[in-house]
């Protein structure tokens, strides 16, 4: 009997994943990861903890995970990757933010923690054959090319391949995604049917393993406020004050706090060296902020580089894919050209697809306006 370790988070997805694997005849064991501690990590503005009567969120989730595993009749272990998460995910995330980039900590977390440190620990300590998670994705072995492929899930709205774009062959070869052929609605129905208390638990949002926070207040724990001018680029007049240029992205409309004028303004330029945020109310300038070409550095090809350079491109998890093509400039530096202009930001990830297969992804280094 093959042994599978399931990363149990306390959420409905990982819980149902464990149940399905038991149903398929695997020897299943759950492992709960704690990767963030607001006290160790000196998080003072933690509204989420206050709302739970000072009970750490990890403890709250662990209690749920324990009840799930008791219900399913499987063993649950608990491990701690707080230091690894800080060193490999959170510090790089902060460094990118300070540079005015738009980093994606969820992608780093999957690469270095969930499918990195977690995989390594489980294989070294639990004598297992596979690791399973509650991600909405799929993996298959392509015999023709002798590689493992990462596939989109049945539930396209919940598909998480965007966040898995940095995985490699070794990680995929030992991974199982039990929810590949299920919708979120079906997952909740299964959980309810088998009597799991978390069947209607709210989906987790926010930064990976940190949870829901007021994002700006949260970052103020680690990045000093650096107020500066907000200037209307069309009139050169100062229209407000920002709390730190790194909190804003090109094209952003919400959160500018410009009084009655807020709704008509959007960010059009960031002068990082002089700490000035430029805004405009001229909608025609939005087109000038859009790009048809973007270059990715450190692009990760999950399997192989396809001969056909026409691809579907996702520039953020929540956005529909667009058509385009790619050109390899050197090593892992890849240039993408979009069929239509898109507003993008350096640091943001581009993820490429062909016929439902996630080919890989990488952070945007720069972009060329149309």
Curated annotation (Swiss-Prot):
Catalytic activity: S-sulfanyl-L-cysteinyl-[protein] + uridine(34) in tRNA + AH2 + ATP = 2-thiouridine(34) in tRNA + L-cysteinyl-[protein] + A + AMP + diphosphate + H(+)
Main location: cytoplasm
Region (Interaction with target base in tRNA): 104-106
Site-annotated residues for Interaction with tRNA: 135, 348
Keyword annotations from UniProtKB, A to Z: ATP-binding, Cytoplasm, Disulfide bond, Nucleotide-binding, RNA-binding, Transferase, tRNA processing, tRNA-binding
Entry EC no(s): 2.8.1.13
Enzyme class: transferase
Disulfide bond sites: 109-208
Pfam families the UniProt entry points to: tRNA_Me_trans (PF03054), tRNA_Me_trans_C (PF20258), tRNA_Me_trans_M (PF20259)
Region of interest (Interaction with tRNA), residue spans: 158-160
GO molecular-function terms, A-Z: ATP binding; tRNA binding; tRNA-uridine 2-sulfurtransferase activity
TM spans (from-to): none
Positions contributing to ATP binding: 7-14, 33, 134
Protein family according to the UniProt entry: Belongs to the MnmA/TRMU family.
Protein name as catalogued: tRNA-specific 2-thiouridylase MnmA
Species of origin: Malacoplasma penetrans (strain HF-2) (Mycoplasma penetrans)
């Amino acid at each position: 009997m093959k042994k599978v370790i399931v990363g149990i988070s306390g959420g409905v997805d990982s819980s149902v994943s464990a149940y399905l694997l038991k149903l398929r005849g695997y020897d299943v064991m759950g492992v709960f990861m704690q990767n963030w501690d607001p006290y160790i990590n000196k998080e003072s503005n933690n509204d989420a903890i206050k709302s739970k009567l000072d009970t750490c969120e990890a403890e709250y989730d662990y209690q749920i995970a324990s009840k799930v595993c008791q219900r399913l009749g499987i063993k649950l272990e608990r491990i701690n990757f707080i230091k690894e998460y800080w060193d490999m995910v959170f510090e790089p995330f902060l460094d990118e933010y300070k540079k005015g980039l738009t980093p994606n900590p969820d992608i780093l977390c999957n690469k270095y923690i969930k499918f990195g440190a977690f995989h390594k620990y489980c294989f070294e300590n639990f004598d297992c054959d596979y690791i399973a998670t509650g991600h909405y994705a799929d993996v298959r072995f392509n015999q023709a090319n002798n590689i493992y492929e990462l596939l989109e899930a049945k539930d396209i709205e919940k598909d998480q391949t965007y966040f898995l774009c940095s995985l490699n062959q070794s990680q995929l070869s030992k991974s199982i995604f039990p929810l590949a052929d299920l919708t979120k609605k079906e997952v909740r129905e299964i959980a309810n049917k088998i009597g799991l208390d978390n069947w209607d638990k709210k989906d987790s949002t926010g930064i990976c393993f940190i949870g829901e926070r007021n994002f700006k207040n949260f970052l103020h724990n680690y990045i000093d406020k650096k107020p500066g001018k907000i200037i209307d680029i069309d009139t050169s007049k100062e229209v407000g004050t920002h709390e730190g240029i790194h909190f804003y992205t090109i094209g952003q409309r919400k959160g500018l706090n410009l009084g009655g004028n807020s709704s008509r303004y959007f960010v059009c330029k960031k002068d990082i060296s002089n700490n000035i945020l430029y805004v405009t109310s001229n909608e025609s300038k939005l087109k000038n902020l859009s790009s048809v070409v973007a270059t990715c550095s450190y692009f990760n090809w999950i399997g192989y580089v396809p001969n056909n350079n026409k691809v579907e491109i996702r520039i953020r998890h929540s956005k529909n894919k667009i058509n385009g093509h790619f050109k390899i400039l050197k090593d892992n530096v890849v240039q993408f050209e979009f069929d239509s202009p898109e507003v993008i930001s350096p640091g943001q990830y581009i993820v490429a697809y062909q016929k439902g297969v996630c080919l890989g992804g990488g952070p945007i280094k720069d972009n060329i306006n149309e």
